[in-house]
Amino acid sequence: MNGGWLARGRSRLAAWRCRARLRQLKLLVLDVDGVLTDGGLWTTESGEVIKRFDVRDGLGIRLLQQAGLEVALLSGGKSGATEQRARYLGLQHCLTGVKDKPAALANLQRQLGLTPAATAFVGDDLNDLPVRPVVALLVCPADAAAPLRRIVRAILKTSEFAP
């Protein structure tokens, strides 16, 4: 009985700390493939790569922007589709073809006058692990790589934004 109370108390404390951390956020950085897409790529016979972005994610990004959060895309892959999606959403920062994600993220923070404490990152794969020291909140989708799921602060259980 006492152990159950302690567990509930700890979860309330963790939720309080998480809410406090969320209030400090000014920048949300999103990986693209596997976060804003399902991770699959279609390739045409001519070699063109096609990605599918979900409209609901776009709405969620716009709502976050309206709430005053700066949203940026950061991807290891170079993609015209990603850059077009960023333009459509009115994102000022779309970094593609990035080989060193922590350095690129730290540079973006400097440009915006922000610290890691004001930054959250959503990633899905092993190449997203190195950003951990430069963000306050590391998050991943439920189907992310297991090593990433083990170290994140939160796992997104669904791909849909809830109002």
Model-predicted segments: where are they?
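Substrate-recognition element of Asp-dependent hydrolases with the DxDx(T/V) motif
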Residues: 61-85, 95-96, 132
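A positional/architectural concept
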Residues: 36-66
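Mg2+-dependent phosphoryl-transfer enzymes with acidic/Ser/Thr/Gly-rich catalytic loops
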Residues: 47-54, 81, 88-89, 93-95, ...
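Asp-based phosphoryl-transfer active-site loop
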Residues: 23-40, 132
